[in-house]
């Protein structure tokens, strides 16, 4: 199996995660600014200045929008994955990882519902938990939501099994169950684990709870795919396409890491719909 495929998968996952995490935080802060909550966006959390503006109406909309955004982006990126030609291997696996990460973040918010405890500055990963608390849902209902999210993770693993295998270089290799399992293991699971380590080391020193929840969700999806890949699956590949190392992906990852580390170390402020600031002096 071509090692370039594994490297490209690691890079694609890291780029996808960093990109969608930023969009997730930005959408929450943008919604909060619309309701006059005066948010300040940090690398690892969002602070709100106008606490008197929190109402049940505002809470539901501010903390629902990021989860819905994750799901919508996941669907959009999956459609892009389906439209990209097979010869553009890196773009295909990048869009596929973006779709998977969108689902991971959406299901992570559902899974975290029972573990929510109110805090003045609730972090984004328990966004649905905030809404559940304000709607006074009982603990049994919250656990039902979490259980439903686990079922969706397994279903997601089944759905993405076929899509993961469509990134293989040769259709003849996919006829063997052992190759399919090795492909999921080396091109999906290993890059996922290494990509999460890279993301954690780069950007989230104070956001470990979020990463743990996302890590569990993604791991369950991929392990489900690994199990389902043992079945006989006919994967449609129009022709064999060797994988080459993507310098575009590596460049994108480098730019994103530099973007995050620069903002985290020095801080950048600008005026818009909300005050946008990232700095390392603020602990959330």
Language model: regions and residue ranges:
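Small-residue-rich helix-interface/hinge motifs
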Residues: 4-5, 12-64
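Juxtamembrane "helix-exit" motif on the non-cytosolic side of transmembrane helices
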Residues: 83-84, 110-113, 195-208, 230-234, ...
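Transmembrane alpha-helical segments of integral membrane proteins
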Residues: 222-236
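Hydrophobic alpha-helical membrane-insertion segments
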Residues: 13-26, 96-112, 257
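Membrane-interfacial, low-structure loops and terminal tails that flank and connect transmembrane helices
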Residues: 92, 164-185, 234-244
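Metalloprotease/metallohydrolase-associated module, dominated by Zn2+-dependent proteases
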Residues: 52-165, 182-196, 221-224
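Final/C-terminal transmembrane alpha-helix of multipass membrane proteins
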Residues: 11-16, 20, 243-269
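Membrane-helix interface motif
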Residues: 30-40, 107-126, 264-273
């Amino acid at each position: 199996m071509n090692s370039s495929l594994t490297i490209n998968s690691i890079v694609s996952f890291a780029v996808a995660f960093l990109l969608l995490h930023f969009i997730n935080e930005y959408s929450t802060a943008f919604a909060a600014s619309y309701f006059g909550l005066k948010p300040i966006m940090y690398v690892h959390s969002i602070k709100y200045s106008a606490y008197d503006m929190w109402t049940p109406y505002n809470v539901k909309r501010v903390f629902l929008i990021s989860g819905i955004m994750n799901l919508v982006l996941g669907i959009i990126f999956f459609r892009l994955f389906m439209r990209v030609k097979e010869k553009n291997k890196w773009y295909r696996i990048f869009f596929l990882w973006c779709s998977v990460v969108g689902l991971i973040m959406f299901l992570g918010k559902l899974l975290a519902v029972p573990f929510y405890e109110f805090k003045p500055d609730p972090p984004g990963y328990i966004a649905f938990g905030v809404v559940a608390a304000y709607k006074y849902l009982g603990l049994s209902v919250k656990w039902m939501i979490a259980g439903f999210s686990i079922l969706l993770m397994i279903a997601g693993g089944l759905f993405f099994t076929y899509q993961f295998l469509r990134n293989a270089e040769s259709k003849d290799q996919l006829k063997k169950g052992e190759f399919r399992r090795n492909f999921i293991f080396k091109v999906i699971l290993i890059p996922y684990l290494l990509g999460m380590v890279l993301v954690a080391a780069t950007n989230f020193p104070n956001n470990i709870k979020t990463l743990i929840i996302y890590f569990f969700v993604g791991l369950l999806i991929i392990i489900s795919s690994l199990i389902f890949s043992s079945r006989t699956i006919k994967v449609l590949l129009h022709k064999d396409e060797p994988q080459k190392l993507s310098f575009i992906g590596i460049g994108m990852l480098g730019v994103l890491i530099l973007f995050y580390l620069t903002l985290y170390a020095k801080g950048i402020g600008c005026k818009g719909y909300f005050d946008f600031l990232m700095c390392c002096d603020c602990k959330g």
